Amino acid sequence: MFKKFDEKENVSNCIQLKTSVIKGIKNQLIDQFPVIEPWLNQIMPKKDPVKIVRCHEHIEILTVNGELLFFRQREGIFYPTLRLLHKYPFILPHQQVDKGAIKFVLSGANIMCPGLTSPGAKLYPAAVDTVVAIMAEGKQHALCVGVMKMSADDIEKVNKGIGIENIHYLNDGLWHMKTYK
């Protein structure tokens, strides 16, 4: 999604949101990530301006005080940015890939089933279309945000094909876009 993303070329405009819209977004975030509720006022303080940065390909990035927090495509579900995920690692369930998959994930490749079932990888129970944080063997922070394309049970049984779709990874265009004022 952000492989060829460039802040100067892809950002079209930035809009400050009304409080009623912010409430709706907060409720949507709580529905989507229930564990975030106690931390939401810390992540999105009431007095701070919340803005939506509109980009090409119908991508919207939610910012507070210039800090990029969440993004979505075509009014779909919200995904946390990796910067937010590094501050609050508990908001998404984790899956762990082995050391051999790290360089491929960091180049934007989807996570294949063998990278989740080999020694060094850890596959936790998760349903299809669950947003997950991809951790790496021996590393502390998440290296990508992805969406489960198969359930954890199916990944273990089939062990072929794409298991998790890579949505946002370290060093992609969104990662390089540190803040937006």
From Swiss-Prot:
Its main location: cytoplasm. Keywords: Cell cycle, Cytoplasm, Growth regulation, Transcription, Transcription regulation. One of its GO terms (molecular function) is RNA binding. GO terms for cellular component: cytoplasm. SMART domains: PUA (SM00359). Transmembrane segments: none annotated. It holds the Pfam family Pre-PUA. The keyword Cell cycle applies. It is found in: Cytoplasm. GO terms for biological process: formation of translation preinitiation complex. SUPFAM superfamilies: PUA domain-like. Residues 92-171 form the PUA domain. The PUA RNA-binding domain is critical for cap binding, but not sufficient for translation enhancer function. Plays a role as translation enhancer and involved in cell cycle regulation. Belongs to the MCTS1 family. NCBIfam families: unchar_dom_2. This is Malignant T-cell-amplified sequence 1. The gene is MCTS1.
